[in-house]
């Protein structure tokens, strides 16, 4: 995980972006704790955004090629109107783990709040080239969805063998 972008969503709890998780640095502390637990030295960069549009515009402005590159895989978890399962999307990349780094492929995940995306947010994600993917019909907490999706990607690419 290179970057984490926390953003407000249309259906998300409005007070979330003003919570202690965000305002007092608790989110960054969680990233540090996760880095220690993983026995890693890499701490993902943390960015805060008021809404999804601002988030995507910020990423586009900072690293235009990230959202434009066809070799990058962009997906948004959505159990309402998925186009594919996350497993099926990732399974298209049947290359060795060492080749992933050399190829420059990035997986860009958009994980919404427990209440999901609005139709307007789905349209915005589609306009930016995101594929709506499911991990089943059940609603997962955001942090659980993030962990599970990362695990599916890593396992599918052979990083957990």
List the predicted regions and their residue ranges.
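RNA substrate-binding interface of SAM-dependent RNA methyltransferases
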Residues: 1-75
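A mid-sequence, solvent-exposed acidic-amphipathic segment
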Residues: 50-100, 105-107, 111
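Short, glycine/charged-enriched secondary-structure capping and boundary segments
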Residues: 19-22, 89-92, 123-125, 148
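Short glycine-/acidic-enriched loop or helix-start segments at secondary-structure transitions
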Residues: 16, 86-87, 119-122
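Structured adenosyl-cofactor binding patch, chiefly the S-adenosyl-L-methionine
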Residues: 119-161
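A C-terminal functional module that forms or caps the active site or interfaces directly
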Residues: 104-124
